[in-house]
Amino acid sequence: VPLFGEYNEKGERIKKGLIIFLENKDNPTSVRNWLMAYAKTNGEFIYKTSIKDGVTFNRLIGYKPFNPDKFVIIITDHLRKLLPERGFKMKETVDKFSEYAVEFRNVCKFTFVHIIHLNRSISDISRRQFDDDKLFPQSDDIKETGNYIFTMFNPNDDKFNLKKHFGTILRTPQGALIYPNLRTIHLVESRHCFCPQHFRVNMIGETKKFTEVIIKK
């Protein structure tokens, strides 16, 4: 099944793809409501009934998907663009969505991929230029709820003025890029494996692919 679905000559979709796009911005609670409806359509919640002092309680204890082989991955691109929740500030809004994500992860086993775009200020860039090849992404605000925290960095960006990165020479003596599609991916936090870990890849944006970087001797 195509990821984006199938379309006829008029551009009309004739078959749904694997990806469901939510184009309109929304707040965390509205997204949670959509996910709740999706979960109910594709499975059933399991409750345990108990009675105390004559009052009946239904406690949520699990979720059973109709298709146990189906993986549900929710990608938020990007997290800071969520609409404010009840007048919350940005951090409070992000924290609320993270809280909801943990609920669905723990109960429904949904996987959440939160994307955050970071823009360094000019003053910060100038300060970090002196680090040269020691420059690599770090986060001082790692979410305790994340299983894995990855960062991606473009060492070829002119504003960083790097000559080498993690021991890899980036430019020829004439200033030409040796690895024009180079990106470095960094596993900075993990609950399930050793970290940090660092990886070099070629990012081919046109085809949305990553390939291994072969270091030139």
Model-assigned labels for residue ranges:
Residues 19-21, 83-95, 125-132:
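Flexible beta-alpha connector loops of hexameric P-loop NTPases
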Residues 30-38, 90-103, 135:
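Well-ordered, non-membrane alpha-helical segments in soluble/globular domains
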Residues 67-68, 72-98:
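Helical hairpin unit composed of two closely spaced alpha helices linked by a short loop
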Residues 1-68:
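Cytosolic-facing regulatory segments adjacent to core modules
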Residues 102-216:
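Phosphate-binding/switch region of NTP-binding enzymes
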Residues 16-19, 69-73, 108-114:
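Loop/turn-to-beta-strand initiation segments
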Residues 26-29, 80-87, 120-122, 158:
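Short acidic, S/G/P-rich loop/turn micro-motifs used as interaction or catalytic elements
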Residues 1, 78-81, 145-147:
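Walker A/P-loop NTP-binding active-site region of P-loop NTPases
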